[in-house]
Amino acid sequence: MEHILHVEDESDIREVARIALEDVGGFKVETAGSGREALRKAEESLPDLVLLDVMMPGMDGPTTFQALRKCPATAAIPVIFMTAKVQSHEVDRYKAMGALGIVAKPFDPMTLADQVRGLWRREE
């Protein structure tokens, strides 16, 4: 079973995604409500994938991504961004940073796991 760390500052979105990824997708999901919490949890649990919200207060998604890449323990963990503002130049920027791709919000809980799996498989 793949272990995903989902980082999202909005608790309702975190919970819907957790249910969608665990119950529909069969993933093991750990959650974090901020970039700082994500860094700590990623280093402790070494997830197989980080699903990372772009817009968060404090440490945003791109900043969190860069911090993950600087830490030797988490540098190779694949990252998929989630954002409500999907524009081609932003998608290109996140991919240039090294992200696997983008999941648009709002997302369909019934297809979220398949979207994540599809982006993840392209990397393998």
What are these regions (language model features)?
Residues 18, 63, 86-104, 110-114, ...:
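Alpha4 helix (beta4-alpha4-beta5 surface) of REC/receiver domains from two-component response regulators
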Residues 11-30:
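Two-component/phosphorelay signaling modules centered on CheY-like receiver
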Residues 31-40, 61-63:
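Helix N-cap/capping motif at the beta->alpha junctions
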Residues 43-45, 69-76, 97:
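Conserved phosphotransfer cores of two-component systems
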Residues 56:
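Receiver (REC) domain active-site loop signature in two-component systems and cognate sites
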Residues 45-51:
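Active-site beta3 strand of CheY-like receiver
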Residues 8:
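Conserved acidic carboxylate
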